[in-house]
Regions:
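Aromatic (phenylalanine/tyrosine) cluster motif
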Residues: 7-8
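Cell-envelope/extracellular polymer assembly enzymes that use nucleotide-activated donors
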Residues: 15-17
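Short, well-formed alpha-helical segments that are part of the catalytic scaffolds
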Residues: 20-38
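Acidic helix N-cap motif at the loop->helix transition within catalytic regions
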Residues: 27-30, 51-60, 100-101
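A conserved acidic beta->alpha catalytic loop
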Residues: 35, 46-55, 92
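Catalytic metal- and UDP-sugar-binding loop of GT-A-like glycosyltransferases, i.e.
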Residues: 45, 67, 89-93
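Conserved donor nucleotide-binding strand/loop of the catalytic core
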Residues: 54-82
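Catalytic-site signature of metal-activated, phosphate-bearing donor transferases
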Residues: 74-81, 86-89, 98-261, 272
Length: 273
C-alpha cells in the first residue's frame, strides 16, 4: 500500500506596489515611473495637475487616481490604502529607484521580510553633483513598509512612516533630484518654512530675537563643519548658507504668526458715540 503524497505549501512571495503622489510633475514623472517599472504595480495619486502629468503617467503604464489635495500625510495614506498589495514603496515624483536598490528590494521580498518597515539612505543631486555632505546626506527615509503595520504620520512638514515594531535598513541609495536650481530651492524653502512655522505655532512654540540670532548660525556650522559641507567646496558652502537662511525664515515667520495673533486678540478701540 502506497502512502499518499505529502504536499508542502511554499511561502508566497510578497508583491510590491510603488505609490507616487503628484501635482504638476510632468518634468519628473516619466523617469520616476520608469525607475519603478520592475514593481508589481505603480500607483499615481494626482491632485489636480494642469500639465501633462496624467497623460505621461498613463502612457508609462501606471494606475492613475485623481483626488483633491488633503495634505501630504493623508494623501500618502490614501495611496497606500488604494494600492493592490500590502507591501508599499512610497516614491516622490522627483526621486528614482536605481537598479542596485531595486535589486536589493526584490531580493528582500523574495523571502518573507523579517521587519515590517525599512529605511534607506537618500542622496540628492544639486548644483551639478551628488551631495554626500551636509544635512542632505545620508537623509535616511522609511519608504518600504507593510501597510498592515505602518502609517504615515505628521502634520504639514516632516511627514514620516510610523512602523509597529523595529525598522530594518537597506544599504543602497534612493536618488533625489530635489531642486532645478537655486531659484527653485529658494521658492521651495519659502513654501516649506511657512508650513514649518505654522506647525510650530500650532504646537505652542514661540520665537524671539535670540532664536533669530542663534539658530541660523548653528545650522550653518552644523552643515558646513560637523556635516563636512566644506568637503564639497562652493556647493557645500552654498547648501550650508541656504540651511541657515531656511532656519532664519522659519523662526521669523513663527515670530510673525505670534505677533499677528497678539494683534488680533487685542481689544479694539471704539469710537465715541
Amino acid at each position: 500500500m502506497t502512502s499518499a503524497p505529502i504536499f508542502y505549501r511554499l511561502p508566497s512571495v510578497p508583491k510590491l506596489s510603488v505609490t507616487i503622489i503628484t501635482r504638476n510633475e510632468a518634468e519628473h514623472i516619466a523617469a520616476a515611473i520608469d525607475s519603478a517599472a520592475w514593481a508589481d504595480e505603480v500607483l499615481v495619486v494626482d491632485c489636480g495637475s494642469t500639465d501633462a502629468t496624467l497623460e505621461i503617467a498613463c502612457a508609462r503604464g501606471a494606475t492613475v487616481l485623481s483626488r483633491e489635495w488633503s495634505g501630504y500625510v493623508d494623501q500618502k495614506n490614501f495611496a497606500a490604502a488604494r494600492a493592490s498589495h500590502d507591501w508599499i514603496f512610497s516614491l516622490d515624483a522627483d526621486e528614482r529607484i536605481p537598479p542596485p536598490l531595486a535589486a536589493e528590494i526584490r531580493a528582500l521580498l523574495a523571502t518573507e521580510p523579517p521587519r515590517r518597515g525599512y529605511r534607506l539612505p537618500r542622496v540628492t543631486f544639486h548644483l551639478g553633483r551628488w551631495v554626500r555632505t551636509t544635512d542632505f546626506y545620508p537623509d535616511f527615509q522609511t519608504r518600504l513598509y507593510d501597510r498592515r503595520a505602518a502609517r504615515w504620520n505628521g502634520r504639514y512638514v516632516h511627514e514620516s512612516v510610523a512602523v509597529d515594531g523595529p525598522v530594518g535598513r537597506l544599504r543602497h541609495e534612493l536618488e533625489h533630484y530635489s531642486f532645478r536650481d537655486l531659484r527653485d530651492q529658494v521658492e521651495r524653502l519659502n513654501h516649506y518654512t511657512t508650513l514649518a512655522a505654522r506647525q510650530m505655532h500650532e504646537a505652542g512654540r514661540r520665537a524671539g530675537p535670540l532664536d533669530l540670532i542663534v539658530h541660523p548660525p548653528a545650522a550653518f556650522l552644523r552643515n558646513y563643519v560637523l556635516r563636512r559641507g566644506f568637503m564639497d567646496g562652493t556647493v557645500g558652502l552654498t547648501i550650508s548658507a541656504m540651511a541657515a537662511y531656511a532656519v532664519f525664515l522659519k523662526f521669523a515667520k513663527l515670530w510673525e504668526l505670534q505677533r499677528t495673533r497678539v494683534a488680533e486678540s487685542a481689544p479694539q478701540s471704539q469710537s465715541e458715540t
